[in-house]
Amino acid sequence: MPRLEEIDDFNDIDDLDMELAELDPSLRTPIAPKITPKVVRSQDQENPAFLPGTNNNSNSNNNSSNEKEQLSFINPKTGKVERSEAISKKDLEEVKRFQVLYPCYFDINRSHKEGRRVPKELAVENPLAKTMADAVRELGILCIFEGEKCHPQDFGNPGRIRVLFKENGQLIGAATKFKGGKRQLMKAVGEYMKRHPTTIESLREIPYGPDFDNIEFKKIPRVKGFKMNEIVPLHSPFLMGHPMTKSVYETPKITAAEKSFKPPKNKYKVVRR
């Protein structure tokens, strides 16, 4: 009999932090930034702390503050996305041990090759990272919400979550209920998302900055040739107002061909004698 082996997906290949243009060298995607070389002068790299008339203490304080970062997490009491206290880069490295889940894992319009990880009966239309976070919170598993991160195959739907599922190779906390590993967890998340389908009102539950106060919540038209959802977060590059993708929705103007100028022919008068 063939031997079946359990695949440990603790180190997820989709846990990527890189520019989209690095994955798309042809730069055919609407938001792929063109990588251009930059020239940096040596005098621009001088440390201002060693220049005369500057305060070295203030510079050291700024450096220490720059080493701190914040994370978004789901408050288990309120169910809302809240910001954590500033954490060091060392603690941030510990967070990267969490396993990653993307919305495209549950997209019913995608094939397994295009990013779907669950069976079609557990997939939904327009999956959102916030709904995934609500599902994990209901299961009692620690969850971190990263609203800006996105899967390279689903760059128009920003958002992903990190879950603390294993530690030292062992299931911990509420995750011990999922002996089947990450696949069983994704099945439970898919069942939750089937019970809570995505609507326009779902977008209001996602935290935004003040720049999005006057933006209307609505569905967006699909573009032929792109795998995209109709309901995406307001900070999605697929929105029609986004300067990087606005041209995708505009019909190109067809300019009439210019008429070529032909010089008049010389006329000759024939005189008969």
Curated annotation (Swiss-Prot):
UniProt keyword annotations, A-Z: Cytoplasm, Ribonucleoprotein, Signal recognition particle
GO annotation terms (biological process): SRP-dependent cotranslational protein targeting to membrane; SRP-dependent cotranslational protein targeting to membrane, signal sequence recognition
Record's subcellular location: Cytoplasm
A Pfam family recorded for this sequence: SRP19
Biological function: Signal-recognition-particle (SRP) assembly has a crucial role in targeting secretory proteins to the rough endoplasmic reticulum (ER) membrane. SRP is required for the cotranslational protein translocation for ER import and preferentially recognizes strongly hydrophobic signal sequences. It is involved in targeting the nascent chain-ribosome (RNC) complex to the ER and is proposed to participate in the arrest of nascent chain elongation during membrane targeting. SEC65 is required for SRP integrity.
Spans annotated as Disordered: 25-71
Name by which UniProt lists this protein: Signal recognition particle subunit SEC65
Low complexity biased stretches: 55-65
Top-rank taxon: Eukaryota
Annotated GO CC locations: signal recognition particle, endoplasmic reticulum targeting
GO molecular function: 7S RNA binding
Signal peptide: none
PANTHER family associated with the record: SIGNAL RECOGNITION PARTICLE 19 KD PROTEIN, SIGNAL RECOGNITION PARTICLE 19 KDA PROTEIN
Subunit architecture: Fungal signal recognition particle (SRP) complex consists of a 7S RNA molecule (scR1) and at least six protein subunits: SRP72, SRP68, SRP54, SEC65, SRP21 and SRP14.
